[in-house]
């Protein structure tokens, strides 16, 4: 609140339940003994600079997320680019990975292949594709199990992940999620097959990137979707309804607000 005040973003004359204005409350808090003690404890007990907990704008972190586009994700995907290991970046902060697609239509199958020691195992240099895990396919689950497995798998740092599912804040590495359109909504991700050439380029400083199929694009776009793609039969009815409504309303870019007229038209 003090930072907001200092940047003129608060109505300091607004009354509060204390009987004082916001400005008066903040002036008291800024000089209060309680605040001073809290700041001292953080420094003396934990070795933490209080101004690193809630940072002022001049010390703000840069964005940690890169927006990626390309012929595999024409409506975009996102990656937590600050979670990519520094040794995977060049001197300009660029992550570049080119490799064959390894396509899975369920998280369970991907985990099994990551743990396998047989011929079906995921190889170093692969691009792990998790398709059909968006809202229509699986309710857009958090694919934590895959990223957790990657952390301990021998090939973990030497491959990339591209999916229409989502990731949590604990994801690490070049894991691109929210690929849009999702595979079951006709997205190109659903056309990929094992061995297809894929190129992922992420500029972690400019926060832009691309995810592309690098083979014959004309032939690729004519393909049927992956034969294994289908909605998860375990999806509850309310999740299926939500997925259908958000898809009718615009998917990734519009589905957060239902388009009532479009939904009625489709009904």
Regions found by a protein language model. Give the residues of each.
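Catalytic or ion-coupling anion/metal-binding cores of large enzyme and transporter domains
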Residues: 1-158, 163-183, 187-267
